[in-house]
């Protein structure tokens, strides 16, 4: 693997193709998007558990993109090019992780952790206190050797929910590009 970073594009919906400048796109690494994210045409992988979005992305994705879906949904599209079944997430079984029941961004994050990387960057990640934040923190705790980077928008503030986690950093896009150039590419 030439680039040791996996970037997740979450469910927030604020990160549009015009925000993906050349420098950022060269440093983003493997891109996994949640469902029909605005950047699905640029993605290496699309993770979806929404039947309508699955139908759309299977028919409209870029040629290089692989679509990942839960087994029940995957079975309907098995003959399409570049669609795969999401893996069995052994590390998440004790949490009763269900690929059909979680959000698409959580499915994308679980997939990134399953693929494995020393650094996983979260762009456009929707933080929501009832379901998303507990799931996100649980996954981050299961993978303590993975550095998670929560990439803030240019005018966004840091959030305090990750203060107790040593493997989480909150940085902006400029800091992300600098960090990638300085450290990640050298791994």
Language-model region placement:
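Metal-ion/cofactor- or nucleotide/acyl-coenzyme-handling active-site neighborhoods
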Residues: 1-187
């Amino acid at each position: 693997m030439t680039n040791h970073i996996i970037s997740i594009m979450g469910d927030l919906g604020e990160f549009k193709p015009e925000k993906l400048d050349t420098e950022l796109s060269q440093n983003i690494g493997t891109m996994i998007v949640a469902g029909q994210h605005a950047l699905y045409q640029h993605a290496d992988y699309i993770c979806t558990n929404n039947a309508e979005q699955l139908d759309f992305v299977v028919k409209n994705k870029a040629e290089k993109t692989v679509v990942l879906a839960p087994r029940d949904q995957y079975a309907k599209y098995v003959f399409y090019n570049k669609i795969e079944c999401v893996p069995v997430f052994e590390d998440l079984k004790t949490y009763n992780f269900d690929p059909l029941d979680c959000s698409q961004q959580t499915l994308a994050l679980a997939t990134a952790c399953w693929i494995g990387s020393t650094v996983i960057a979260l762009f456009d990640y929707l933080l929501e206190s009832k379901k998303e934040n507990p799931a996100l923190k649980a996954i981050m705790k299961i993978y303590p050797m993975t550095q998670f980077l929560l990439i803030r928008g240019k005018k966004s503030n840091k959030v305090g929910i990750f203060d107790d986690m040593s493997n989480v950093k909150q940085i902006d896009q400029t800091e992300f590009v600098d960090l990638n150039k300085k450290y990640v590419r050298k791994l």
